[in-house]
Amino acid sequence: MRDVHIDKVVVHMGVGESGEKLVKAENIMKTITKQTPIRSVAKMTQPAFNIRKGAPIGCKVTLRGKPAEDFIKTSLNIVNKTIFESQFDKSGNFSFGIEEHTDFPGMSYDPQIGIFGMDINVVLERNGIRITRRRMQKKKLPEKQRVKKEDAIAFLKKEYSVEVR
């Protein structure tokens, strides 16, 4: 009941513009994650970057279950199983980035496509979180049942042999 597990992994690529570059990023993400990405849109207009509100500027995929665990293992190997303590939030979630998609197995550099980086966000939880999400008789999650930063670090060290600096 107190064991920490991965709820979901969100992989995000921010391209900054729509068009051909975004389509290339979507194809790369589909190859890496084996799922179809959805487009993320700009929340506000940024005239300095020629970005309009509502314009598609990136893509993302949410992974759960076994695919999420496999993706995390591969991603942590790419960053040499090292995560900094500042990459954790107070709820035990953590995020890290990968600078080049070519680091993934089976991916190679193509001058027609270029190089894309990605952000990986991992949400950790314990069993019993359903009481906050269910439709009837919602309740607040007890403090002892919440995942804390220290719990997340211990989970990563135990399950994935990650070094936290």
From Swiss-Prot:
UniProt key word RNA-binding: yes
SUPFAM superfamilies reported for this sequence: RL5-like (SSF55282)
Keywords for the protein's UniProt record, in alphabetical order: Ribonucleoprotein, Ribosomal protein, RNA-binding, rRNA-binding, tRNA-binding
GO cellular component entries: ribonucleoprotein complex; ribosome
Any one of the GO BP annotations: translation
Highest taxon, organism lineage: Archaea
Protein family according to the UniProt entry: Belongs to the universal ribosomal protein uL5 family.
PANTHER family the UniProt entry points to: 60S RIBOSOMAL PROTEIN L11-RELATED
Subunit annotation: Part of the 50S ribosomal subunit; contacts the 5S rRNA and probably tRNA. Forms a bridge to the 30S subunit in the 70S ribosome.
HAMAP family per the UniProt record, alphabetical: Ribosomal_uL5_A
Record-given protein name: Large ribosomal subunit protein uL5
Organism in which the protein naturally occurs: Methanoregula boonei (strain DSM 21154 / JCM 14090 / 6A8)
Organism ancestry: Archaea, Methanobacteriati, Methanobacteriota, Stenosarchaea group, Methanomicrobia
